[in-house]
Amino acid sequence: MTALLELRDVVKHFPVRDALGRHAGAVHAVDGVSLSVAEGEVLAIVGESGCGKSTLGRVMLRLIEPDSGAVRFAGEDLARLSPSALRARRRDMQIIFQDPFGSLDPRMTVAQAIAEPLRLHRLVPRAEESGRVAELLRRVGLRPENAGRWPHEFSGGQRQRIAIARALASNPRLIIGDEPVSALDVSVQAQVINLLRDLIRDLRLTFVLVSHDLGVVRHVADRVAVMYLGRIVEEGPAEQVLGAPRHPYTRALVAAMPGAQTKTPPLEGDVPSPIAPPSGCRFHTRCAFAAERCRAETPQLEGAGHAVACHFAESLPPPAERIAALGGGERLARLQSFFRGTAPSPIGMGDQA
């Protein structure tokens, strides 16, 4: 498949200063990440809080400038685009933010918020704006007659639907979803995930999902990339990464899923500081299989199809855990019940979160 988005050795560090304003190091948010996303594919980037996944998502859109490396979209190096060319290219790249309460301007009505990208990119004549806004609201399960209302009049789930409608307004080829359902109630999460699945299928979208919730990821993603302290430690098809994880960190994440049937012990210790990450394999301070080589030598992400950055991936014992969805788990069971037959509300005014 043709790659729509390509990242090569992308690095992003954030400088840290002490109380006197002196340089005191840097946060290693993204360190040498290389990824590709095929046209029409859903890639999930997962990991613990602070691993760099949200920063990576913003770097993909050049909302944050990388320190080094290349980000190519549809064959173009985004770093080489002029401001005007980048502005025009943004029509094809959109983002859905995590917080539905903070991502909408409280001084703009729903119609104004959704129509803004239409005007910025001059996509439809002014006379046709209201019709396009109504069409987008219907597509995300909201009533067009509520277009004149203000964001504070909607629930969290409804606001996130509005944010999705706004992201769709410019007919993008790529959408980044930065934890798009993590702030919502579980039942509302299921509705929004179901909506996203339908949109991805019907509009043939390329979607990058940033998430810490493997239960959500399993229902949406074609491929999964696992991040730890700014680096990709495992990447491959979702069924393989979540069903037969090869990296010790991925195994621990899968084992921590609600309802997982596993003998894998939970991770011990805290995540090391991203200001001073460990040498060699950054996971060695918490890994039960770590050896001296792990402390001294950085493992490379290797493997055709299912890649892993671990010196001992081939010699590790088979993973003991199974995906929670196979064994049960109340939360995932509730999600699955929605996927089996409950479509998003055609009105969209019943969300409670």
Stretch-by-stretch model annotation:
Residues 3, 16-21, 26, 235-341:
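Short catalytic/signature loops enriched in Gly
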Residues 150-154, 158:
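Conserved ABC ATPase signature
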Residues 169-173:
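A short, proline-enriched helix->beta-strand linker immediately N-terminal to the Walker B motif
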Residues 69-77:
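Conserved ABC transporter NBD signature motif
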Residues 19-24, 78-94, 120, 127, ...:
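ABC ATPase NBD coupling module
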Residues 176, 180-263:
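P-loop NTP-binding/switch modules centered on Walker-like glycine-rich loops
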Residues 77, 128-145, 254:
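Conserved ABC ATPase "signature" region
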